[in-house]
Curated annotation (Swiss-Prot):
Underlying gene: nleF
Species assigned in the record: Escherichia coli O157:H7
Keywords associated with the record: Host cytoplasm, Protease inhibitor, Secreted
Subunit structure: Monomer. Interacts (via C-terminus) with human CASP4, CASP8 and CASP9.
Annotated protein name in UniProt: Effector protein NleF
Gene3D superfamilies xref list: 1.20.1260.90
Length: 189
């Protein structure tokens, strides 16, 4: 369950922490902290988008937030590509790293925006329960193709926030962003 207010008080009470004491690395984190939670501006944006989506009566109204969300996702992927790099792609030694000149603050900014996207997806899924509306372009933005980098990052974020599912090895350390998702010698299309 996501927090309903913008305050950072007792945020860990609603979140599963999978880090098991494993330290974060410069390029990724195994636990979320106050640097990753929504800023008041992002919380307001989340509330407005969820409200518009929840109150929509048809697909045209559902698409009202599509342009803004599409730009946000595009900016998020641009940020990911400018902050991080993948080395030894298509090998068993694939690793992710911060690009030269990038800082932990840049990493945290990406994770915060990713947390916004995860939160929006969860809230929209909650608002869709019991509705017969067809999935629209907004929902499709929030559910990227399984071979994409964004899918891997959202999957890892979900595991940190909600707890791991069966598609994760229980002994794996979950890291956000998941820079090596679908980048090794074995890939899915």
């Amino acid at each position: 369950m996501l927090p309903t207010s913008g305050s950072s008080a007792n945020l860990y009470s609603w979140m599963y922490v999978s880090g098991r004491g494993n330290p974060s690395t410069p390029e990724s984190v195994s636990e979320l902290n106050h640097n990753h939670f929504l800023s008041p501006e992002l919380q307001d944006k989340l509330d407005v988008m969820v409200s518009i989506y929840s109150c929509a009566r048809n697909n045209n109204e559902l698409e009202e937030i599509f342009q803004e969300l599409s730009a946000f996702v595009s900016g998020l992927m641009d940020k990911r590509n400018s902050v991080f790099e993948v080395r030894n792609e298509n090998t068993d030694e694939v690793v992710g790293a911060l690009r030269a000149g990038m800082t932990i603050e840049d990493r945290d900014s990406y994770i915060r925006d990713l947390f916004f996207l995860h939160s929006l997806k969860v809230k929209i899924e909650e608002s869709r329960q019991g509705k017969e509306d067809s999935k629209c372009k907004v929902y499709n933005l929030l559910c990227p193709h399984h071979s994409s980098e964004l899918y891997g990052d959202l999957r890892a974020m979900k595991c940190l926030v909600e707890g791991c599912s069966d598609d994760f090895n229980p002994f794996d350390i979950i890291r956000v962003p998941d820079l090596t998702y679908n980048k090794g010698s074995l890939q899915c299309g």
